[in-house]
Amino acid sequence: KAIADYKASKYQDDINEINSQIEQIKFYNGFTAVRGPGIMVRVSDNISEDPELDIMERIVHDVDIVVLLNDLKAAGAEAIEVNGKRIINISEVVCAGPLIRVNGEVIPAPFVIIAIGDMDELYDAVTEEGTYAYELKNTYGMEVVAAQGYNLTVREFRGINYETKYAEIVKEGEK
């Protein structure tokens, strides 16, 4: 028993370090829920009854959400979700008729985006004159409402089973 205890304690530091690295990798890749300061942005369709306004100009499109997400990333967002769907490197935001598909699930408007990061930087990225969100609101009449929060939560990624067909891991030393 003493030998087994010795071996277990000898490797415990290595095991703890590996577990710590796994948790860090999960965090950086969106596989853990996170909490912190940031903003919540609600984006929804133009509700104007103006018959002159084309229906395609009255609805929020996938590209609108993609541009908003990119603006938030550029402003330093550390974690983002749209209607509860965590945005990670393999997330897709694509048109699905009057809806959008995120991580393989179809979601309707209104679109609620939560981004964690510097509240002021993120808020400015969606409210200042000249930003895409400002244009959506003031040129196209979309509802774009942003609010800051000190204790927002972005859920962990739960989505599609991503399968690689072409990419292979390059081992260290290989070219």
Regions found by a protein language model. Give the residues of each.
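Soluble extracytoplasmic domains of inner/organellar membrane proteins
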Residues: 47-134
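Extracytoplasmic/luminal low-complexity segments enriched in Pro/Gly and acidic/polar residues
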Residues: 120-175
